[in-house]
Amino acid sequence: MSEIKKENFVHLHCHTEYSLLDGHGRIKNLVQKAKDLGQPALAITDHGYMYGIVQFYDACKAAGIKPILGVELYTTQDIHEKKDRKTGHIILLAKNEQGYKNLVKIESIAAVEGFYYRPRTDLKVLKEYHEGIICLSACIQGDVPQLLLEGKQEEAYALAKEYKDIFGEDYYIELQYHGLEDQKKVLFPLVTLAKTLGIQVVATNDIHYVEKQDAFAQRTLMCMGMKRTVDDTEALGYGNPPHWYFKSEAEMRKIFDGVAPEAITNTMVIADKCNVELKRGEYHLPKFPLPATIKSNVQYLRMLCEEGLHRRYRKDAETHRERMEYELQTIEKMGFVDYFLIVTDIISYAKNHNIPVGPGRGSSAGSMVAYCLGITDIEPTRFGLLFERFLNPERVTMPDVDIDISPEGRELVIQHIIEKYGEDHIARIITYSSLAAKGAIRDVGKALNLEEALVMRVGKYIPTGPDVTIAGILSKNKAMKKEYDENADVRKLLDISTSVEGLIRHTSTHAAGVIIAPDAMTEFVPIQKDKNGAIISQFEMGSVEAIGMLKVDLLGLKTLDVLNAAEKAVNSKKQKGEVKLDLTRLKMADRSVYAMLSSGQTTGVFQLESAGMRDVLRKMKPTCIEDLIAAISLYRPGPMDSIPKFIQNKHNPDTITYAVPALEPILKDTYGCIVYQEQVMQIVRDLGGYTLGRSDLVRRAMS
């Protein structure tokens, strides 16, 4: 295999799929193209937002490409004026860590204070936060090129000089040429302006898709966003030639060597200037505000745990002390003391204000410390739950406690968090909605102006459900394949729909996630406002976790409000002196309840009400809480295949066999079936001789 030739050119103006309904190039494909061409670096400059920064950074690092982190922002004279919708463009690239921090601040100000139809910045903001940032004059929509187009040469020169005064040698006049008339008009005037003012020029290609043949798909995508059709020439915006693809150095030199050859060389100069590292393995935990009498967070956590140990276990407290001490030492060693104090405070606040909170879910139920602190109400040893599944000293990751909470009280709890840590320290988390198969076909059909009947007919081939892809259905459905082969409109519809399938359609706010930062949120994460005016991160859940932010999941669960209302309704009928109903103290061995469940009378019962689950309960005939836990755990894709064996073994215990005797104590409660990930960990520990920490690594590799 021949060695890839190294190119001396870098693309510094590149739109990914995070330029919503405009960027067609997926990050992984753009990065791979840079690698294939031998280009040493690549920039991300999405429209208005920094959504894809972390994914882009990771993809570049994995491919051996230097990531250049940036954004294409909109400019206005004064971000506080909300009258004129007209904006210019600039490209901002981070040179170093300080530059990246300033980029986050500029972006956040633009998306919060400066937002008027789109995020906007101005010279005043740029003056304050310019350190460590390179500025390019952007595309034909840049404010300097626009002034030249309008014949306002003096104003163009004056504005370019202002940018130069702010950024110095890090301000560049950006040159682009895609055959547009407006670009022809300003190309040489921009070169002249740069020479006159002593500003360097740089060549870019304003990438919106990877390959030349992707042009029509990208144009269709753009029309989807504009709610127009490809027949509407106004929607096309930038002419017919497919020039906005990922070009090689040779292709770029062919355009610019006769204009300003240094514009190509300067891409490497800029790339050499940009050296940002997004550090991993660091956690940005806020300090929990301690009572005046407490000297340290460790002292306070231990005091609360000691109180909880005696409250939870009473006379058996000492028998559980060893495990609690092990957990505490692990928490202290891993540096997560403040995390536990913060979560404890949140749940305590909710309970003290009569806001229903769930008993605990997920791996946090395996922590005795969480149980003693009141974070969970599930005693871990009774159910064989393992602390290492939650917090593994051999795999340092942030703890993750999911908190089920009353939807009616959720905002009150969030307000408490804001008051405790400061409004500028808190943000909800963004989430992205992608174009699913059926939706892609519908939207592409509209953009292509195809007959509605045809689009609806093709759409009916696509079933609803997760993991459904157009290509997957096309490979299995003969009728659909026949139409694809014989009908050109169907083929065009499905080809373009497949091309845009999975791209981000719009953003919304995550139902549960809240970030708490040790300093102002904009020291770590770019922010914006959601449609309700709440501050949200521009990074989605995975990116927030990747950069080490503390995330708390407050999941509004309506069932908690229903249970709370039911408890109150029952108690309102109680006579004076009668024992009040307390749902937290219900007996788990009530035969009449299991008889009702076994008959499938579970309509309205959380997680047990679907027709399929009712059928499982009728066949399983649960007799204990462990049976219910197993039923819920098994009733999902994959593990569902084990349900018949589980039921068979439950009703015929004499037929249960174990591959080796050591499996019996681990699998006895689940009738010889492996149901839980904790069982996997125990098997690896007992049969493989691993520690529980190492066993957890095996579990993660399997899951």
Where are these regions (language model features)?
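Alpha-helical scaffold/interaction cores of sigma-54-like transcription cofactors
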Residues: 2-703
